[in-house]
Amino acid sequence: METVKTTSGKTPGEADASPLKPGDSYVQSFARGLEVIRSFSARAPEQTLSEVAAATGLTRAGARRILLTLQTLGYVRSDGKYYALTPRILDLGFAYLSSTPLWNLAEPAMEALVDEVKESCSAAVLEGLDVVYVLRVHTHKIMSTNLGVGSRLPAFWTSMGRVLLAALPPEELRALMARREQRAFTRHTLTGDDELYAEIARVREQGWALLNQELEEGLISVAAPIRNARGQTVAALNISGQANRTSEQMMRERLLPQLLAATRHISQLLSASGRMHL
């Protein structure tokens, strides 16, 4: 099953805050508004005023002002007790996708890959300690899933995350390693620093990552990088399946070659577009 657990063990308001310190150009009220939006999630789709204030660290009065502003703008609704995001919030996320024309080119390649391998395919980028899904093509098999565009998962324990982490400069990787969550998601989870460094080094050398039930029992996936014209890794693509019908050997022998062909094709499209980033 592909059930999202947590992102990085933090509340949405805490997750992967920018290490940059606010300066004169920092608009605190705007930042607080974003924190309020991020406090809503699959685990907290509806919240009271007190819950929003607790999740964001704001006072009740401050949280109320922001919620009422968002409600006036149409991004939040309320029944008088509970607040929830409205579909209009999708405009903010789709602005990113619509401003990134590569995904209009990548999606057909991903759909073709799904047709070939009969497994789901996703693309993600790295944001702090998380991978953020920016495109997902589902297989037609009947299965439970709540992963979609905008979903976040802990980078150290996803195949796409390890591909993206493997491309980081050593100092950035060390900084993220020091901040990562210290727990095992399953009995298969790699938790030690030495284990994770060794695995990420192996991913860097071989150019792809395979994870077998480290984040969730029953979930197996393989991922490879999408690179720009300079050879820089800017995103990752994966194929995910269920371990009870997809073995590591099948992933390596049958699915990996097709995944690598797809990432090469998408990388070529990115290079041809002249864009350096997604």
Enumerate the predicted regions with their spans:
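Short, solvent-exposed recognition segments
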Residues: E2-D16, I142-L215
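Sensor-regulatory modules in signal-transduction proteins
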Residues: I226-A229
